[in-house]
UniProtKB/Swiss-Prot annotation:
Monomer. Catalyzes the conversion of dihydroorotate to orotate with quinone as electron acceptor. It is a peripheral membrane protein. This is Dihydroorotate dehydrogenase (quinone). Belongs to the dihydroorotate dehydrogenase family. Type 2 subfamily. Its cofactor is FMN. FMN binds at residues 61-65, 85, 139, 170, 213, 241, 265, 294, 315-316. GO terms for molecular function: dihydroorotate dehydrogenase (quinone) activity.
């Protein structure tokens, strides 16, 4: 239903500022009955992270920050949904305006600053949907004014790990000062050790997988250290990548491109895919990868998979293409799987060496 309405709603939504339009979308989703998602072609199924995903196409964190409408989003056909980011105490984030559409570039810049209703509110919403079907994850961070950021991640993990299928440790948001410093080897080692321990202490049979979300703007030496630390500390997967602080010369919306914040959408595709491929070359099948950044078509999702992604996520593309994009991507993946004549899992990372050098 939403997919058919989007062409009519898009001019209205895009006439509004981006954040207001997004709140209206969340409101609309909350009013619609969350029906069962459409049945997926079995060739799209993925078994990873200790779960059986009906398809590999997920919704990235940031769309449903407060876990208000996860079931409505799953009903759109996503194989999984990641809510958040969540921080322990409510915080307003950065002043508005803080999100900008670069329409000519099919991109978005945001500097939300991890605005969140706080851990208690999100945990209550997730607890209220216990027992419902669908694979759900949560993205966690630290309060901007936290005196002990590691403790913030531990608190979020303890409260949420028994309510979701995976917890994504976000140390890569460019909009919280100093947060990306936690990607440094010493900090990261301590952080992951404590988060994994907190997950293991959670008295829940669900045992959420722990994922780590990293920035696209790191060096290969940093990637070496991050992947080694993740493997050593028992992290179950990497999410590659968050938004970029870089501004490619190809951007046409030059005035908006000067806005501070993280850039997502189509311009992020190449750098995030290169990093994804480099990560796969380092970890192989020892650590599942989630490919994020510029996934706006079946071909883009297919490329992420060949670069090493077992799962993919999208968000910014929905701003321009609407929810019907999910169905289009899945149909395109089925066509490509049929053409190749091999299971989807056999295609993961097949072209990583070449895609690590993509322009």
């Amino acid at each position: 239903m939403l997919a058919s309405l989007f062409p009519l709603a898009r001019p209205v939504l895009h006439a509004l500022d981006a954040e207001t339009a997004h709140r209206l979308t969340i409101r609309a989703l909350s009013l619609l009955p969350a029906g069962a998602p459409p049945a997926d072609d079995p060739r799209l199924a993925v078994s990873v992270l200790g779960r059986h995903f009906p398809n590999p196409v997920g919704l990235a964190a940031g769309f449903d920050k407060g876990a208000e409408v996860p079931d409505a989003l799953l009903s759109l056909g996503f194989g999984f949904v990641e809510v958040g980011g969540v921080v322990p105490r409510p915080q307003p984030g950065n002043p508005r305006p803080r999100v900008f559409r670069l329409t000519g570039d099919r991109a978005v810049i945001n500097r939300f600053g991890l605005n969140s209703e706080g851990l208690a509110v999100v945990a209550a919403r997730l607890a209220a949907r216990a027992g419902r079907p669908g694979i759900l994850g949560v993205n966690i961070g630290a309060n901007k004014d936290a005196t002990d950021r590691l403790a913030d991640y531990v608190a979020c993990t303890r409260a949420l790990a028994g309510l979701v299928d995976f917890v994504t440790v976000n140390v890569s948001s460019p909009n919280t000062p100093g947060l990306r410093d936690l990607q440094g080897e010493v900090f990261l080692d301590d952080l992951l050790a404590r988060v994994v321990a907190a997950r293991d202490e959670a008295a829940s049979p669900r045992r959420a997988a722990i994922l780590l979300k990293i920035a696209p703007d790191i060096t290969l030496d940093s990637l070496d250290a991050i992947t080694a630390t993740a493997l050593r500390r028992g992290v179950e997967g990497l999410v590659i990548s968050n938004t970029t602080v870089a501004r490619p010369a190809s951007l046409t919306e030059t005035t908006l491109a000067a806005e501070a914040g993280g850039l997502s959408g189509r311009p992020l595709f190449a750098p995030s895919t290169r990093l994804l491929a480099e990560a796969f070359l380092r970890v192989g099948d020892r650590l599942p990868l989630v490919g994020v950044g510029g996934v706006d078509s079946a071909e883009a999702a297919w490329t992420k998979i060949r670069a090493g992604a077992s799962l993919v996520q999208l968000y910014s593309a929905l701003v321009y293409a609407g929810p019907g994009l999910v169905r289009e991507i899945k149909a395109g993946l089925v066509e490509r799987i049929a053409r190749e004549g091999v299971p989807l899992a056999a295609l993961v990372g097949r072209d990583a060496a070449a895609l690590a050098r993509m322009e």
